[in-house]
Design a protein with these regions (language model features):
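N-terminal module of bacterial RNA polymerase sigma factors
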Residues: 1-34, 182
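Internal acidic/polar
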Residues: 3-9, 95-119
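Amphipathic, Lys/Arg- and hydrophobic-enriched alpha-helical face
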Residues: 28-46, 63, 130, 175, ...
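Structural recognition of an alpha-helix C-terminal capping motif at a helix-to-coil junction
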Residues: 37, 51-58, 71-83
Length: 184
């Protein structure tokens, strides 16, 4: 279990150049695991998730002086991770010019052969269903279902209304229910 730090304490450490590194180490210790799993649910590959997590923390470190405490630190980190995932997925899609189904098929193949995937058949079926969702719906579903994140915090991350996020989650759930119902 990762240590839990008071956000004000960490922010105070980040303000001083002499303690900035220690403050950032606390951020990494606090948020690495939950950010990893959020990223992993989007890209599914352990190696890609690790790379994107590292990129997220590098960008956070390089831009820590620009962090405004108007939002929570976790919201800011999730936003960076979300942008990293979107950039990665867009590059993957652009590189795959064979067909529109190829990226999903490739991702599904990676999931099925991933030695780090420890889920059962139900979890595998859910992950396959998630692959059929548009990226934003998948991200909203992951944040709500797995992270139990409040819509208000998601609104800060996505820069969209709570109502739109609720609708996106509802549509995602309906699509997943339909897909899982067809597999029975």
């Amino acid at each position: 279990m990762n240590p839990s730090y008071n956000e004000r304490e960490v922010l105070a450490l980040l303000q001083e150049e002499s303690t900035q590194k220690r403050g950032f180490e606390m951020i990494v210790a606090q948020y690495s695991e939950q950010l990893y799993w959020q990223i992993r649910r989007m890209v599914l590959s352990h190696e890609d998730a690790n790379d994107l997590l590292q990129n997220t923390f590098v960008k956070a470190w390089l831009n820590i002086d620009y962090f405004r405490a108007e939002a929570k630190l976790s919201t800011w980190l999730y936003r960076i991770a979300l942008n990293e995932c979107l950039t990665f997925l867009n590059k993957q899609r652009a590189a795959s010019t064979v067909s529109l189904d190829a990226p999903a098929a490739d991702t599904l193949q990676k999931l099925e052969s991933d030695p780090y995937f420890s889920g059962d058949k139900a979890q595998m079926a859910l992950q396959k269903a998630l692959l059929t969702l548009p990226e934003k719906q998948r991200m909203v579903f992951n944040l709500k279902y797995y992270q139990e994140m409040k819509y208000e915090q998601m609104s800060d991350i996505f820069g969209t209304s709570v109502g739109a996020l609720k609708a996106s989650y509802h549509h995602a759930v309906k699509k997943i229910e339909k897909i899982l119902g067809e597999e029975d």
